[in-house]
A protein has these predicted regions:
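ASCE RecA-like P-loop NTPase motor cores
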Residues: 1-231
């Protein structure tokens, strides 16, 4: 039944694609719901009397409407914003350099490498450098690893995630080059992490089947997919 359902490709509420694994010489037919609200209603909410969602990122400003709509919650569902105990205006600064090439330029990664080298030396490490591309991550890491005097460099993949975080915490003037899982869910207390450098904003690849289908659906409704979804 599952094979017939996927093979028919005729349910507009689902996204279909084929994944090819060249190493194992096989392929997968994949189907996933375009929207998950009805699936959650049928398979989760109906079985529960109460449910609590908590996260640092489910509200936009102090508005939960986007989150509620996307997972099938009623607009009058109770919500609450618990404000941060940190005084961000006094405890942090955000810098956006205006003299770095566009990420699509061929010189971008080389320019970023020089910029990072100067910044990491000045800050004496204690930094996460977050990438959206493994190729850029590896290129910059191997370019800088022999020039970062007195700074201990760690790269995503050199050890399991938890072990790598522990290595960073116990490192001397550490810098961690990471992607994917290091963008969220990592908590480094104290002065061992004093800066986070985002090399490029983590927009999803437009050619990803799920992303592409969601963008097409939003556009078909006459809405701006960049504002409504990607940002």
């Amino acid at each position: 039944n599952n094979f017939r359902f996927i093979n028919d490709f005729d349910d507009e509420e689902f996204i279909y694609w084929i994944e090819v694994n060249s190493r194992k010489s096989n392929s997968k037919l994949v189907a996933t719901p375009l929207k998950i609200d009805s699936e959650l209603q049928k398979n989760l909410y109906i079985n529960l009397k109460q449910i609590i969602f908590t996260s640092a990122t489910i509200a936009i400003g102090s508005n939960f409407s986007y989150f509620k709509e996307s997972i099938g919650l009623e607009e009058d569902t109770l919500d609450k914003v618990i404000h941060s105990p940190f005084d961000y205006d006094k405890q942090m600064k955000v810098y956006i350099p205006d003299d770095i090439p566009n990420p699509s330029d061929r010189d971008f990664v080389d320019e970023i490498s020089e910029f990072l080298k100067a910044l990491l030396i000045k800050s004496r490490g204690k930094t996460f450098v977050l990438f959206t591309s493994y190729s850029a991550l590896n290129y910059v890491y191997y370019l800088l690893r022999d020039e970062a005097n007195g700074i201990e460099l760690f790269i995503h993949g050199m050890a399991p995630r938890t072990h790598l975080v522990n290595m960073y915490v116990n490192g001397r003037n550490p810098v961690l080059f990471g992607t994917d899982s290091f963008w969220e869910g990592v908590d480094i207390k104290g002065k061992q992490l004093s800066s986070v450098i985002i090399v490029k904003l983590p927009f999803k690849v437009p050619s990803d089947p799920v992303t592409e289908a969601i963008i097409e659906n939003i556009t078909a409704q006459g809405k701006n997919s960049f504002i409504e979804y990607q940002i």
